[in-house]
């Protein structure tokens, strides 16, 4: 059994670790609230631009944007959204597992793939598995800006426009609530009328004709690019909210575990100290009896 000095050292070490995890838990809780506010603030814009895009798509303009033309999938792009930092439980592991499944399914169908990494963890993973990475953006910080994302996203959008790829998928962690986050892989392109108008009522409501200024092609070109960018930004915002929630939960679990370990070590320390005192008393009594 370890001596009292060694046990005290262990207790001190665990106490110091608990202080760190407790501080990280509090920081993550603060960042989580801000991330959730950003996520909620982005939703009205994404929803409004989806509504307008649905109007454009379902009004049957004479011009049909390439983003809305379905074709046989021989090559595909995959945008992978992960975190820059760790210590967030199984968040990255879960979404990267979904990415692995998606890549395997596409390869089994003979589909070539190219990827875009948003986040350091995704960049490192795609490099390890030998995936073709055509663009990336890392170190977004705690406040994502669309300006930082546009360059990496545009590589995939331009490839789709040029016919170099036939579909684009988006992988990220969807925020459900503080305790639950869900990894998802969604098809980003091509867009469909069913995706834009999510109900029959919407389809009927958006079925009238429009007069375009300056013309349908210019309006639809600009609108659909902004819509896709909004979808990716929303995914990044949800991923960041999920990251901070997962980190807060992970740090709370670490703090609770440290508290339990300290209690167990304290019990061992007390027993060891009691045994040492008992032994000393026994030696004193034995010495006195011998005299």
Curated annotation (Swiss-Prot):
<comment type="function">
    <text>Produces ATP from ADP in the presence of a proton gradient across the membrane. The gamma chain is believed to be important in regulating ATPase activity and the flow of protons through the CF(0) complex.</text>
</comment>
<dbReference type="Pfam" id="PF00231">
    <property type="entry name" value="ATP-synt"/>
</dbReference>
<dbReference type="InterPro" id="IPR023632">
    <property type="entry name" value="ATP_synth_F1_gsu_CS"/>
</dbReference>
<keyword id="KW-0813">Transport</keyword>
<keyword id="KW-0406">Ion transport</keyword>
<dbReference type="InterPro" id="IPR000131">
    <property type="entry name" value="ATP_synth_F1_gsu"/>
</dbReference>
<keyword id="KW-0375">Hydrogen ion transport</keyword>
<dbReference type="GO" id="GO:0042777">
    <property type="term" value="P:proton motive force-driven plasma membrane ATP synthesis"/>
</dbReference>
<dbReference type="GO" id="GO:0005886">
    <property type="term" value="C:plasma membrane"/>
</dbReference>
<keyword id="KW-0066">ATP synthesis</keyword>
<keyword id="KW-0472">Membrane</keyword>
<comment type="subunit">
    <text>F-type ATPases have 2 components, CF(1) - the catalytic core - and CF(0) - the membrane proton channel. CF(1) has five subunits: alpha(3), beta(3), gamma(1), delta(1), epsilon(1). CF(0) has three main subunits: a, b and c.</text>
</comment>
<dbReference type="GO" id="GO:0045259">
    <property type="term" value="C:proton-transporting ATP synthase complex"/>
</dbReference>
<keyword id="KW-1003">Cell membrane</keyword>
<keyword id="KW-0997">Cell inner membrane</keyword>
<keyword id="KW-0139">CF(1)</keyword>
<comment type="similarity">
    <text>Belongs to the ATPase gamma chain family.</text>
</comment>
<dbReference type="GO" id="GO:0005524">
    <property type="term" value="F:ATP binding"/>
</dbReference>
<dbReference type="InterPro" id="IPR035968">
    <property type="entry name" value="ATP_synth_F1_ATPase_gsu"/>
</dbReference>
<dbReference type="GO" id="GO:0046933">
    <property type="term" value="F:proton-transporting ATP synthase activity, rotational mechanism"/>
</dbReference>
<protein>
    <recommendedName>
        <fullName>ATP synthase gamma chain</fullName>
    </recommendedName>
</protein>
């Amino acid at each position: 059994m370890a001596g009292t000095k060694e046990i005290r050292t262990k207790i001190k070490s665990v106490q110091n670790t608990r202080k760190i995890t407790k501080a990280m838990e509090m920081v993550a809780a603060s960042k989580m609230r801000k991330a959730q506010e950003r996520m909620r603030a982005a939703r009205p814009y994404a929803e409004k631009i989806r509504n307008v895009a649905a109007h454009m798509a379902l009004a049957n303009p004479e011009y049909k944007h390439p983003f809305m033309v379905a074709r046989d999938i021989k090559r595909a792009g995959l945008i992978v959204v992960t975190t820059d930092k760790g210590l967030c439980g199984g968040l990255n592991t879960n979404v990267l597992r979904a990415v692995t499944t998606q890549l395997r399914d596409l390869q089994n169908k003979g589909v070539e793939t190219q990827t875009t990494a948003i986040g350091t963890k995704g960049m490192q993973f795609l490099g390890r598995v030998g995936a073709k990475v055509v663009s990336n953006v890392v170190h977004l910080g705690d406040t994502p800006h669309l300006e930082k994302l546009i360059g990496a996203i545009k590589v995939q959008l331009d490839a789709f426009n040029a016919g170099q790829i036939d579909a684009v998928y988006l992988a990220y962690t969807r925020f459900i609530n503080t305790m639950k986050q869900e990894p998802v892989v969604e098809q980003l392109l091509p867009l469909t009328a069913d995706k834009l108008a999510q109900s029959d009522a919407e389809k009927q409501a958006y079925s009238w004709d429009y007069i375009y200024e300056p013309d349908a092609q210019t309006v639809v070109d600009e609108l659909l690019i902004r819509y896709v960018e909004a979808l990716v930004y929303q995914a990044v915002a949800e991923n960041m909210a999920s990251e901070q929630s997962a980190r807060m939960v992970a740090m709370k679990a670490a703090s609770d575990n440290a508290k339990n370990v300290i209690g167990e070590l304290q019990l061992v320390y007390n027993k060891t100290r009691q045994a040492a005192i008992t032994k000393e008393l026994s030696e004193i009594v034995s010495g006195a009896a011998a005299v």
